[in-house]
Amino acid sequence: MAARSVSGITRRVFMWTVSGTPRREFWSRFRKEKEPVVVETVEEKKEPILACPPLRSRAYTPPEDLQSRLESYVKEFFGSSLPSNWQDISLEDSRLKFNLLAHLADDLGHVVPNSRLHQMCRVRDVLDFYNVPIQDRSKFDELNASNLPPNLKITWSY
């Protein structure tokens, strides 16, 4: 037996041994050995690197009868009798605004993005949005097609 003094108090510390083996070795006999965990490897299919980035939006060309289509939708949702300045009708009612824009998106195949919805305050704003054509080309394609100086070339495959 060994004795220790901790702040004036004497303690007895026993060396814990069972049949001549230290405590750690005694208890380690009862521990189960952990089996090594085999990690299954999953083969990932790697997609080929694109030669050019995918296009963000589809092309849109406004139809010739856009104004008459929009006027018919406005008559359908806001009533058959329209004032002469029907393009200045306010779109404050969110249900009517949603119905109008949803039907136009289905009909024309071009959706008003979320970032522009707050700008659609009047029917004229909707008409102006749908009158703008959208090209299906990226800026790099436009640069490639334009007349570039001889020392500047755009090459997709490198």
Curated annotation (Swiss-Prot):
Top-level division of the source organism's lineage: Eukaryota
Subcellular location: Mitochondrion
CC terms in the record's Gene Ontology section: mitochondrial large ribosomal subunit
Alphabetized UniProt keyword annotations: Mitochondrion, Ribonucleoprotein, Ribosomal protein
PANTHER family the record matches: 39A RIBOSOMAL PROTEIN L50, MITOCHONDRIAL, LARGE RIBOSOMAL SUBUNIT PROTEIN ML50
Protein family: Belongs to the mitochondrion-specific ribosomal protein mL50 family.
Subunit structure: Component of the mitochondrial ribosome large subunit (39S) which comprises a 16S rRNA and about 50 distinct proteins.
Protein name: Large ribosomal subunit protein mL50
